[in-house]
Design a protein with these regions (language model features):
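N-terminal [4Fe-4S]-dependent radical SAM core
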Residues: 1-71, 241
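Auxiliary Fe-S-binding modules of radical SAM enzymes
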Residues: 1-16, 20, 37-40, 161, ...
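Intrinsically disordered, low-complexity sequence elements enriched in Ser/Thr/Gly/Pro
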Residues: 25, 34, 105-107, 138, ...
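Charge-rich, low-complexity amphipathic helices
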Residues: 40, 47, 117-118, 222
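Conserved AdoMet/S-adenosylmethionine-binding subsite of the radical SAM
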Residues: 53-208, 215
């Protein structure tokens, strides 16, 4: 499915649903959307945000003619504790059989990702990512870093909920950052974004600033579209160096 998410081109949800695991989950957009779809009697969401397979879309990537960047499971966590290998294996088979696409796997449970890829090869056309919203979750980055492969490894700091100036980006190929959206959005001070950006510059890691979200650079709450995505007057939309060759 085409998407407006700035750092990808399509979303694919052969599995959806999740449970809260950390601070970033507090205002989960996917949970709200899943409940809305359930209320609209969409068959695949009849159980709401419960971790569920959606076999109806499993073969979707075969029909995409244009090579695409694909965010896998935007409506949940592919490596949730309740997702067994018997669900993951068919997803990986589709990925391997569609090498024209690049698949972005983003999880808040990188230990499960690490364990899975100890048992199975990492497809060449995947990027592996984890969410890290503040310094309390640096261990997720360590788990991601420990996965033995040459694939792009990336971090999503959205919503950014704490200063991360001292982040270790050794072995990390890309950092995404953004503020929270929605009526209950928590404000991210400009200093936190600057600190993360400057850390990326020190580590020579491409930095992608997605959005301010509901709170602007000036600390005023307004539409995320009005707040835009300029940090200190500049757009930061850097990509992993390999992306130039895709």
């Amino acid at each position: 499915m085409a998407t407006k998410i700035e750092w990808t081109e399509r979303t694919w949800n052969p599995i959806h649903g999740c449970t809260e695991v950390s601070e970033a989950c507090q205002n989960c957009y996917a949970k709200v959307m899943a409940k809305r779809l359930q209320g609209n009697h969409i068959k695949s969401y009849e159980e709401g945000f419960k971790v569920t397979r959606n076999m109806d879309v499993m073969r979707e990537p075969y029909g995409w003619k244009k090579s695409s960047m694909v965010f896998v499971v935007s409506m949940g966590d592919l490596f949730h504790d309740d997702v067994p290998d018997t669900w993951l294996n068919p997803v990986m088979r589709v990925i391997e059989k569609t090498p024209q696409h690049t698949y972005q796997l983003l999880t808040k449970r990188p230990w499960n990702m690490e364990e899975y890829f100890l048992r199975h090869p990492v497809p060449k056309n995947v990027w592996l990512g984890t969410t890290c919203e503040n310094s309390r979750h640096y261990d997720r980055i360590d788990a991601l870093r420990s996965i033995r492969c040459n694939n792009v490894k990336f971090i999503s700091c959205e919503p950014l909920l704490g200063a991360m100036n001292d982040i270790n980006l050794d072995g990390i190929d890309w950092v995404i950052a953004g503020g929270e959206s929605g009526s209950r959005a928590r404000r991210t001070p400009v200093e936190w974004f600057r600190g993360l950006r400057d850390a990326c510059l020190r580590w020579n890691a491409p930095f992608f600033f997605k959005q301010w979200g509901a709170w602007g650079e000036d600390g005023v709450k307004r539409s995320k579209y009005l707040n835009g995505s300029l940090l200190d007057g500049q757009e930061w939309r850097q990509w992993p160096r390999v992306a130039n060759n895709i």
